[in-house]
Amino acid sequence: LPPSSAASDVYKRQVVSLNAPGFIGNRMLFGYTAQANMLLLEGALPHQIDQALESFGLNMGPFRMMDLVGLDLGWRARKLSGKESPLHAKIGDELCEQNRYGQKNGAGYYNYTEGSRAPNAAPENEELYERISQENGFTRREISDEEIVDRCILALINEGANILSEGVAQRAVDIDVVYINGYGFPIWRGGPMHHANAMGLDVVVEKLNKYKELTGNDVYKPSELLVSLAENNLKMGDAPAKADRKEKLGFEMSSVANNF
């Protein structure tokens, strides 16, 4: 069967991706979850972050998702390789040191009762959050739901633009198809690239610069593609196709480096 027929037979949607680390969806997810963890270090709590993003329309917030997948996967890999925990993984790795691995053993960012996947608050973790934040130079602060949504969704949008400019994805709509069908992005928002258009690319660039100044994190350094499209009053769908698409077996980027 041709690929399109095979995909349809198992009720899947397909897009073409360059052979590259993380492909499209997971590469964007790395930066998204890293920023959720940075918000936790800075003062927000898991349930607040999850509720803000679920209110935006995502099927599942990042901390519920990480508990579902298992907090110990990256932690065990880092221990085996002798790598130090990256900043955004400090809290998750410390939870693992305390045998809190997520749903698999009933305790992670949330607590779980036997036989249930419903998350319950874990106030006993808050002392750990305070300690890890302080040890890493953060004074915890009040963080608004607006900042939570902005920082997590902008991380997706900016990395999506980088993926598009590198030719890893051929079209902005392909990125939207991946995120709506595979990552729980709200269909009524059209996907992260369509949502960027709805926000206005000039607004997206302005907000990215704002959070780059606030956090110093290069994940918010506006993609050159975004800047160019915004300056020319264009949309994500107007991005020029990349003719010399070659597989990328490695790359350097702030949102992916040291995630594992």
Regions found by a protein language model. Name each.
Residues 1-7, 11:
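Single conserved hydrophobic/aromatic residue that forms the stacking wall/gate
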Residues 14-260:
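Substrate-binding/catalytic subdomain of NAD(P)-dependent oxidoreductase enzymes
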